[in-house]
Structures are given as C-alpha cells and as structure tokens.
Amino acid sequence: MQTLKVSDVSLIYPGHHKGAPVTALKGVNLEVKSGDFVVALGASGCGKTTLLNLMAGFMAPSAGQITLGDRPVAGPGAERGVVFQKHALLPWLNVIDNVEFGLKLQGVDARTRRERAVKNLALVGLQDFHKHMIYHLSGGMQQRVGIARALTCDPAMLLMDEPMAALDALTRETVQELLLQIWQQTDKMYFFITHSVEEALFLGSRLIVMSPRPGRITHTYELDFNRRFLAEGNARAIKSSPDFIEMREQILGIIYGDERAGEQEKIHA
C-alpha cells in the first residue's frame, strides 16, 4: 500500500514590488493512502491548487516535507498523474496517440504502449474513438481522454484540479459516475479539487475543507456516499437523501462562514 504524506507544509510567496510576503499555506498535514479518494474544498484562494502543485512536485514547500512512500517528493514523477481543468491534450495527435504519449516519452515499447492505451480507453468508455482527432470530441470526451492518458502511465496517485469545472451539468454527472467506477477498479490514491460541495460529497471517501489564506485544513469528514452509489447505482436518490442534504448544508455553512471571516480580516487589515 502506497501513502503520500504532507507533513507540516507551508508555502510563502515573496512579495512583489517590495510588498510583504504572502503565506499561501501554513502547517498543512495530510495522508492519502491507496484506495483513498480525498476531495479538497474551500473558497477561492484558499490554497487548494497550491497544495496539489506541491504534491505533484511542480513547486517546493517553504517549510515541511511531502513524501511518497519513503522518498521525498522533489519534482514531478511518473508515479503521480495529473489531470487539469483544461485537458492539455495535443490537437495534432489522435485519441490513442495522445493516450500513449506519456509512455512514449518514457521510452516504453510500442506494443506495451498500445496495450495500455487500449485498456484505459475502454475503461473510460472510448474504445470506439481511437482514431478520432481531439478537436472532434466533446468537452466531456476530451476530459475522459485526459483521464485515460494519466491512467496509462500507471501512476500510484491521480491528482485532479477541477477537471469537470468547464463541463455542462449533465456531462459532469456522467463523468463523475465514470470516475467512481474507475476508482473502484483501481487501487490508487486520488486527490481531487472542486468548488462544488455536491460534487465533493458525491465523489469523496474523505473531504477536507480548507480555510481562506493562509490555507489550513480546518475540517475533515469521512464519507460513504460514493460507495453507496457504487452499490445502489442511483446518483439522484443519493444526492436528494436527507443525510446528503444535511451534510451539504453543514459544509456550505462552514465555507460561507470562512469567506465572511476572510472578508472581515481584509477590511480591518
């Protein structure tokens, strides 16, 4: 079992034009283990994406440490796949060549690349679109290609930064359900960022709520709505259930309370 640990991590940005430094994250502690689906929620500017970038190795913390297994995270690595809000696919390549691209950069042989790509395109329901060009696909299908590409490199962890933010409501629900089915079939660590409380509750096995800057984890919830969906198959019934609605209102109260507190701090600063 793999574990990614965030240990007392802080990040401070230097001030611009002789301005004061900005503390984006302060004293963040988090563990993500194989099979976890951790969702981060919080107001804009609370440091969710900053935390993901640190976990991905795109940035280094100002204090504290991030480790994967017994090794420090010192930069990007194939063991951590990233899916962005904008898909970052290569428009001059067709679907299957996009999915194979990461493995090609790693020097993996053509037969192995193709086998893995075919497997993961089937996993995201795109087994009939291998030769289609990216610009011929809908937004939801493009994001599914991005997920397949990340999975094809067989990372221990999948980091997802609001991958459904630009999708329409119906497509978003479809991709959410697909993502849970993939989670059920793969023993990986998932870290997912969203601004949607409903999405966070539906997807996460654990939900962390972050405070306004400096970002800290203020609340943690263990959830089972995702497992209920996988067992029952009725997303609408789960999202309209009394316990789901009660939890949603509780989380909204926390986030809106934090936003108001942050606004008051700015007013009195």
Swiss-Prot record:
The answer to whether the entry has keyword S-adenosyl-L-methionine is no
- Which key words are in the record? ATP-binding, Cell inner membrane, Cell membrane, Membrane, Nucleotide-binding, Translocase, Transport
The keyword Translocase is annotated on this UniProt entry: yes
Q: Quote the annotated effect of residue 74 to T.
A: In strain: DSM 65
Q: Which reaction does it catalyse?
A: taurine(out) + ATP + H2O = taurine(in) + ADP + phosphate + H(+)
**Which segments constitute the ABC transporter domain?**
4-237
Where along this sequence does the record place binding of ATP? 42-49
Membrane topology recorded in Swiss-Prot or TrEMBL? Peripheral membrane protein
* InterPro entries according to UniProt: AAA+_ATPase, ABC_transporter-like_ATP-bd, ABC_transporter-like_CS, ABC_transporter_ATP-bind, P-loop_NTPase
User: EC number(s) on record?
Assistant: 7.6.2.7
Protein family membership: Belongs to the ABC transporter superfamily. Taurine importer (TC 3.A.1.17.1) family.
Subunit relationships:
The complex is composed of two ATP-binding proteins (TauB), two transmembrane proteins (TauC) and a solute-binding protein (TauA).
Q: What is this protein called?
A: Taurine import ATP-binding protein TauB
Organism equals Paracoccus pantotrophus
**Highest classification ranks of the organism:** Bacteria, Pseudomonadati, Pseudomonadota, Alphaproteobacteria, Rhodobacterales
